[in-house]
């Protein structure tokens, strides 16, 4: 398992723990704020371009133990910024100041630094930010949850997007990841020695439009 997938699994674990503690993922901003509060972090919404954001969309101040984020966009977009900074705290220990200049909630995994060739094309900072973005998306919209809603409960991607207050493109990308990628750490889930295969791109795309 690579570091990116490990980060996503940790985000899913935190999502489930937050839900178990009473968090409501259909209210993404409140959900992200609750996780920050549970970690003793102060969170402040600032106007776009505020000097304290240091030219970014969100920052983490390790000395103050606080997250500052740009107060614009939907609740989901603001929650994503907070969750992105939480990724730095959870995965890196919160020992470094961070300025997040840009985020891509609907980033395709093909754009992430997976494999030697792609990693060589990325600098350390870019790889780090990709991982935090995927952490944030997994925290707000875990793949197993979306797969369950879509495949077993029959919800369309539009219905899931409405339930979580998330952009449709983000939900569809996360669903594609859930349907196309093999589940991590599931040895021999189908019979002795067998491994369940992920859906093909065509099959997954067909499911998304149903």
Report the location of each language-model feature.
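Active-site hotspot residues in diverse enzymes, especially metal/ion-binding acidic/histidine motifs
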Residues: 1-210
């Amino acid at each position: 398992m690579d570091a990116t997938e490990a980060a996503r699994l940790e985000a899913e674990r935190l999502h489930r723990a937050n839900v178990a503690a009473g968090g409501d993922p259909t209210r993404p901003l409140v959900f992200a704020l609750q996780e920050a509060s549970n970690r003793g972090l102060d969170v402040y919404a600032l106007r776009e371009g505020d000097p304290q954001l240091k030219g970014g969309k969100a920052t983490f101040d390790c000395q103050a133990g606080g997250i500052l984020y740009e107060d614009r966009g939907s609740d989901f977009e603001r929650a994503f910024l907070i969750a992105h900074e939480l990724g730095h705290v959870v995965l890196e220990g919160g020992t470094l100041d961070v300025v997040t200049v840009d985020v891509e909630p609907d980033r395709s995994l093909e754009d992430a630094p997976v494999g030697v060739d792609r990693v060589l094309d990325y600098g350390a900072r870019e790889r780090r930010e990709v991982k935090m973005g995927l952490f944030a998306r997994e925290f707000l919209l875990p793949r197993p949850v979306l797969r369950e809603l879509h495949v077993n409960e029959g919800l369309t991607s539009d219905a899931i997007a409405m339930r979580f207050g998330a952009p449709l493109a983000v939900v569809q990308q996360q669903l594609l990841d859930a349907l196309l990628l093999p589940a991590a750490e599931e040895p021999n889930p189908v019979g002795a020695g067998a491994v369940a295969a992920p859906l093909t791109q065509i099959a997954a795309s067909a499911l998304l439009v149903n």
